[in-house]
Amino acid sequence: MKLIEPQAIRLLSSTVPENDAPAWSAGTAYQIGDSVIHEHKVYKAVADSTGKQPDQHSEGTDAFWRLMGPTNRYAMLDQYVSTQTVAPMGAETLTFTVTFNRCTAFALLNFKATSIRAVVKDGDGLVMYDRTVNTLKDVDGYWKYYFLPLERIVDQAVTNIPMSPVATLEVTLTQEGGPALGQVIAGQAWPIGTTQYNTRLGIRDYSRKDTDEFGNTRLVKRANAKRTSLLLYLHPSRLDSVREILARMHGLPALWLGDDNEGIGSYQSLTVWGWLEDWSATVIGPNEVSMNIDVQGLK
């Protein structure tokens, strides 16, 4: 198992325009229903206003604006996997470049693409990593190939990039009908331990289920988020360093790779973007520590 501790990254370029709405202007009079962009987020007016900066007047009973979410261009850089940056209509590729300073790993989550190319360059333009991945999953047998829909991976993590003080990551996603990407993460990868059998995984469902007095149930489908309980083995010599890493991650989102095999056949269900809920370690003997890590995913 590995953990990717994310670092702040900056979008340098993108083929996706930021044209969801006009930019907010302090001198413009806005009416109810108007939409604006402010600091890469879309706001909708809930009251007439002039000079009311959206991020400062979007909460409480006297709010003038309601936050609707990130712009399409920056949806892949918010904290949520479910909000996707989608290529412009008619485009079959989505290309962007972000800073990759002092990073050793990156991950692309909740994407829709038939192929992905990632290129990492240092500050002098030297290519340190260049790989193209076909997202088609392995097919187990001819019957599945001919009679079942082909499946594709939706998450991909790479944790073996050489570190450079100044670097960039350029990604190109290709998909007929338009690619999309839910989250891009860059940071440092830390080995935690070896994932054992009896690891548990599931989801937290945010859908509503209301049943009235007559037994009629109304279901409202909403988002869900991954959750996992990882059982790990590690050597006692690594316990202190792992404890420091986990202590640093409390209350912060990170990418947890329960299966750090970066091939197509890895268990993607054990890849969770979320926060550390709890962990405990048991020193079984002089050469073995058993550790439980509970992670709750972000939707």
Question: How should each PLM-predicted stretch be described?
Answer:
Residues 1-10, 14-15, 70-91, 101-299:
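Extracellular/virion structural assembly segments
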Residues 1-85:
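Tryptophan-rich substrate-binding surfaces of secreted polymer-degrading and adhesive proteins
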